[in-house]
């Protein structure tokens, strides 16, 4: 993702010269089974075991075990995987010596795209959070936003628009994106209580400002320039926050209904993203 945005800024040729080998090495490492917890299945999707340890940014732990044991095919992992494959193929498209690699990456991406839609897109129009064997987690969570925000998507525009409508309706707040829909089981919008109580609530409803970056990207991909005014109205509310609580910054998370909590590196990353977007 980062290298892709570097390529958008500097151009494909400069990016290929500087980071081309790095991109190729990462994909080869995964395809050849080098990663200890990313397994490429025949359907083109990446499988990860998260039953006993956290493997995603939803990393709350109680008594050494994940509060949210996301395991199997994770929606954001596979959205990023598809994006990476298509980007690498585009990066080396003009390099004849890499023709066989490009063909391999595109062949895997074709499988990934078909399997992604079949695996994650449900009848209600949004993306399930993860799938492990016969078990699908239908909780409405913001991880689908990462997949929706990418330039290379397995979903067509109509599918992305329908999924984004669910995010807007159930997860969007004036202070960020909820980590869980109020309609989903286990929703807890407030991060209060003992350490254990707070860990259980951490990704169960409080809103995260940093996710507004992914939301903005996904929204603009659907609505284009006509969506800018709506996003500006959403983001303008953060200006007052920078003079309260976390002076010069933004709180890490807010109640799902919305009071600010402590500052965090996630939000710093989100702030940088927003500044880039607004420029």
Language model features with spans:
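Short, solvent-exposed segments of well-ordered alpha helices
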Residues: 68-76, 131-138, 199-206
């Amino acid at each position: 993702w980062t290298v892709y945005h570097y390529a958008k800024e500097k151009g494909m040729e400069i990016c290929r010269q500087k980071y081309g080998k790095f991109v190729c090495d990462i994909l080869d490492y995964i395809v050849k089974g080098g990663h200890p917890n990313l397994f490429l299945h025949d359907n083109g999707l990446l499988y990860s075991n998260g039953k006993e340890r956290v493997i995603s940014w939803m990393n709350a732990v109680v008594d050494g075990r994940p509060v949210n044991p996301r395991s199997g095919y994770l929606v954001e992992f596979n959205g990023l995987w598809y994006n990476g494959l298509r980007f690498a193929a585009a990066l080396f498209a003009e390099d004849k010596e890499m023709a066989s690699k490009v063909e391999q990456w595109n062949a895997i991406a074709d499988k990934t795209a078909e399997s992604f839609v079949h695996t994650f897109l449900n009848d209600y129009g949004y993306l399930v959070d993860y799938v492990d064997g016969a078990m699908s987690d239908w909780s409405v969570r913001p991880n689908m936003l990462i997949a929706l925000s990418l330039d290379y998507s397995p979903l067509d525009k109509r599918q992305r628009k329908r999924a984004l409508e669910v995010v807007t309706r159930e997860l969007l707040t004036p202070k960020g994106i909820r980590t869980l829909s109020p309609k989903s089981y286990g929703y807890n919008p407030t991060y209060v209580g003992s350490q254990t109580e707070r860990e259980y609530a951490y990704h169960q409803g409080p809103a995260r400002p940093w996710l507004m970056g992914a939301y903005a990207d996904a929204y603009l991909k659907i609505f284009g320039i006509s969506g800018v005014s709506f996003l500006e109205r959403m983001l303008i509310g953060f200006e007052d926050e920078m003079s309260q609580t976390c002076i010069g910054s933004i709180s890490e998370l807010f109640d799902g209904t919305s009071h600010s909590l402590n500052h965090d590196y996630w939000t710093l990353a989100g702030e940088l993203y927003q500044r880039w977007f607004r420029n």
